[in-house]
Amino acid sequence: MTFRATVLTLYPEMFPGPLDISLAGRARSAGTWSLETVQIRDFATDKHRSVDDTPAGGGAGMVMRADVLARAIDHASPEEDARPRLLMSPRGKPLTQSFVRELATGPGAVIVCGRFEGVDQRVIEARCLLEVSVGDYILSGGEPAAIVLLDAVVRLLPGVMGNESSGAEESFESGLLEHPQYTRPQTFEGREIPEVLTSGNHRKIAEWRSAEAEQLTRERRPDLWLGYHRAKGGT
């Protein structure tokens, strides 16, 4: 089954962008996933092709209009479309590895890229848009966030990664950050590869990696560490 991605945007020229190279690019060429863009402005009805207006109640910036966006969504995703409808938004649900994995098992996604000060709340509710955030910062628009989401999803599609075990060993899959990685040369500017990693003792290697992952997570992501600790039965 091909994972079908449809992106609604004011800047379709931003796609596929980096999604056309490396793993994602090869997977798209192989038909593992497909990408369609929809120009939101094509669904404006006035001579200026307006897609935004001033915010109700006053304030800075402009807001994307519900009527224009609804027509674009209805065109891209009719009622029988089983794909989730996502709106890239800084106030959305955090994009996590578990959510990415959930999306990767589905038929695809319809992704709306917001611009300006935001999107009229009425179309978010009327078209059941799930708001998704890639982090606690503001971008110029939802397009870079959509690229991040799609890159994360595509690499988990069947056959995309050469080593199927790679995805299971990465950061977040176990609830922890990934352990440090090393490769040749054995010595770099006086720094050695940890001896345990060249010992050939797989049990000790696994123990070292687990301990390092726990330490890194505890130091750098106390939020993840708390969730991991609770899941392991801690208090």
Curated annotation (Swiss-Prot):
Report the principal subcellular site.
cytoplasm
| Superkingdom classification of source | Bacteria
The subcellular localization recorded is: Cytoplasm
Which EC numbers characterise this protein's activity in its record? 2.1.1.228
Q: How does it assemble?
A: Homodimer.
Q: Which organism is it from?
A: Chelativorans sp. (strain BNC1)
> How is this protein named in the record?
tRNA (guanine-N(1)-)-methyltransferase
- The entry marks the following residues as binding S-adenosyl-L-methionine, namely G114, V134, G135, D136, Y137, I138, L139
Spell out the Gene3D superfamilies in the cross-references: 3.40.1280.10, tRNA(m1g37)methyltransferase, domain 2
Q: What keywords tag this UniProt record?
A: Cytoplasm, Methyltransferase, S-adenosyl-L-methionine, Transferase, tRNA processing
Q: Which reaction does it catalyse?
A: guanosine(37) in tRNA + S-adenosyl-L-methionine = N(1)-methylguanosine(37) in tRNA + S-adenosyl-L-homocysteine + H(+)
Q: Name one GO cellular component term.
A: cytosol
Biological process annotations from GO: tRNA N1-guanine methylation
Query: What is the documented function of this protein?
Result: Specifically methylates guanosine-37 in various tRNAs.
InterPro entries under this entry? Alpha/beta_knot_MTases, tRNA_m1G_MeTrfase_C_sf, tRNA_m1G_MeTrfase_TrmD, tRNA_m1G_MTases_N, tRNA_MeTrfase_TRMD/TRM10
Enumerate the Pfam families for this protein: tRNA_m1G_MT
Q: What's the gene?
A: trmD
Keyword Cytoplasm part of the UniProt annotation: yes
